[in-house]
């Protein structure tokens, strides 16, 4: 199983790349975490945010494989504890499908992305900065994997 983090935006600060890559290196070979960055359209003064969100959504959907299990990261999604995430990860692994985690741009995910999603996951009711979400996701995925392996990284 491959996990794809499909995120709108690029040109992250060095600390984001360093933090994200630290956890990517720790992921097992049979469950690699791959980042797919979707370029953010230019946001000019009179740009229509709805049209930009649709454009971002089309690019996200083009990055998906036909058999991907899609998880949209949405504030309104279901909240999981880390042990619950590890259970989700085990179900994803057992399904044999690749997993695509979708992170929208500043205006969120398009309706088409939400419609394509098999699940919606909320990291927090707070609005989180997109750079931080990348690091947080990578760490939580690694932590969930360690729970499945009985590794002492996660402590209750």
UniProtKB/Swiss-Prot annotation:
Disulfide bond found in the keyword field: no
GO MF term (any one): rRNA (pseudouridine-N3-)-methyltransferase activity
NCBIfam families (UniProt xref): PRK00103.1-4, tRNA_RlmH_YbeA
InterPro entries: Alpha/beta_knot_MTases, RlmH-like, tRNA_m1G_MTases_N
Matches recorded under PANTHER family: METHYLTRANSFERASE (PTHR33603), RIBOSOMAL RNA LARGE SUBUNIT METHYLTRANSFERASE H (PTHR33603:SF1)
Catalytic reaction list: pseudouridine(1915) in 23S rRNA + S-adenosyl-L-methionine = N(3)-methylpseudouridine(1915) in 23S rRNA + S-adenosyl-L-homocysteine + H(+)
Any one GO cellular component localisation term in the record: cytoplasm
Similarity section: Belongs to the RNA methyltransferase RlmH family.
Binding site for S-adenosyl-L-methionine: 73, 104, 123-128
The protein, known as: Ribosomal RNA large subunit methyltransferase H
Role according to the record: Specifically methylates the pseudouridine at position 1915 (m3Psi1915) in 23S rRNA.
Entry keywords, A to Z: Cytoplasm, Methyltransferase, rRNA processing, S-adenosyl-L-methionine, Transferase
Subunit and partners: Homodimer.
Location in the cell: Cytoplasm
């Amino acid at each position: 199983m491959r996990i794809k983090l499909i995120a709108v935006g690029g040109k992250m600060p060095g600390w984001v790349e360093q933090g994200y890559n630290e956890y990517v290196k720790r992921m097992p070979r049979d469950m690699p975490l791959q980042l797919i960055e979707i370029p953010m359209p230019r946001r000019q003064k009179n740009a229509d945010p709805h049209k930009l969100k649709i454009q971002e959504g089309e690019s996200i959907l083009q990055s998906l494989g036909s058999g991907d299990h899609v998880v949209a990261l949405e504030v309104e999604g279901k909240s999981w504890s880390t042990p619950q995430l590890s259970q989700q990860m085990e179900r994803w692994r057992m399904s044999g499908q690749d997993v695509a985690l979708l992170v929208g741009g500043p205006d969120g995910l398009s309706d088409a992305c939400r419609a394509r999603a098999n699940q919606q996951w909320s990291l927090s009711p707070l609005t989180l900065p997109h750079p931080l979400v990348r690091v947080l996701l990578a760490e939580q995925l690694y932590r969930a994997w360690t729970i499945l392996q009985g590794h002492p990284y996660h402590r209750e």
